[in-house]
Structure formats: structure tokens, C-alpha cells
Amino acid sequence: TLVSMSDEEFPREYCGWWRIIESSLWGSADIDIAGPALISMTGYDDRLRMFVLLAYLKCNPTKAGVSFTWQGAWEYDPVSGTGSVRLRKDGCISGRIKIKNGEESTFVAKRTAEPDEPIPDPPSYRDKWRQRW
């Protein structure tokens, strides 16, 4: 788990849960294939779920918004990367997510409530092989 900072240091306008509603590279048809596409930004134990990506985030405020590093799994493949978000005039956030040595996409998210079910931990290859036997 990546841990960021105390709640007092995290900008209130970004703090909370956000529902990802658009993605430039991967489209929007399958955005919820692993469950509702979400990003949490609180400065502590933050998560990302989009398509088949499950990841832990480490968020840091910047002058322009919030930047983050992340690590997790794309299906069962370990992946990591970076990203950033900025608040728009309409109250949504615009973001960018980049997979290390891979693709990059922009996204749009709107504020939402914390999900009833937590975002699961990213799976590992061990989990993949357990399911086959």
C-alpha cells in the first residue's frame, strides 16, 4: 500500500472519491468491466479502478492540481506509472494516466460517494494460477 500524507495537507477540493466517466485512449464502453471506474484521492491508501486496472495511488498536491504515482495490476500483469488531475470549472476533474513504458490516456471524472464495496487489491500471478487449479 502506498501512503501519501495527512488529511490536513491534502487540498479539500480534490479530496474524496471520483467516478471516471470518460477515457480518451481506451474508450468508455468497457470502462466499468472490473466494477465502477473510480479514483480516490485523500492522501492516504488511495485506489484506482479503470477497465482491468486495479492500483494503489500515492497522491501529492501541486500548484496545478494533484499528481500521483501508482502501482498495481492490469489483469494479472504488474504495472506502474504516473498521473495527474486538475479541477475544471464545472466541478469535474480532468486527468492523465500513463503506464510506465506504455500507453497514456486522459480521463474525466465527477465527484461521487465512497463505494459500498472497497476496490479490491491488485491481483498477482499467484492469484491467476490459483484460479486455474
Q: Residue spans of the language-model regions?
A:
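Edge beta-strand at a domain terminus
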Residues: L2-Y14, R19-S23, T62, D90-C92, ...
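N-terminal glycine/threonine-rich, aromatic-flanked beta-hairpin/loop signature
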Residues: E8, W17-I20, S28-G65
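Short, surface-exposed coil-to-beta transition loops
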Residues: I33-P36, L53-Y56, P78-T82, G102-T106
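Mid-chain, well-packed structural core segment of small domains
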Residues: C59-K89
